Amino acid sequence: TICYNHLTRTSETTEICPDSWYFCYKISLADGNDVRIKRGCTFTCPELRPTGIYVYCCRRDKCNQ
């Protein structure tokens, strides 16, 4: 699987996920008055943390844009 792995305000970059890491994720986190978005590969879909706004998890190449 190929996933985007850039942060909110950086240029788009991708990574090839390690074997058995089938999911791409996109998570938004509240940071004071700002919202940060984090992307990457994962073995299982991440859970929403108290500072999180949403989590998106998918299994297709570059699906976490």
Swiss-Prot record:
InterPro entries: Snake_3FTx (IPR003571), Snake_toxin-like_sf (IPR045860), Snake_toxin_con_site (IPR018354), Toxin_cobra-type (IPR054131). Expressed by the venom gland. It comes from the Eukaryota. The keyword Cytoplasm does not apply. Disulfide bonds join 3-24, 17-41, 45-57, 58-63. GO terms for molecular function: toxin activity. Signal peptide: none annotated. Antagonist of muscle and neuronal nicotinic acetylcholine receptors (nAChR) with highest affinity for neuronal alpha-7/CHRNA7 nAChRs. Homodimer; non-covalently linked. Belongs to the three-finger toxin family. Short-chain subfamily. Orphan group VIII (haditoxin) sub-subfamily. This is Muscarinic toxin-like protein 3. It comes from Naja kaouthia.
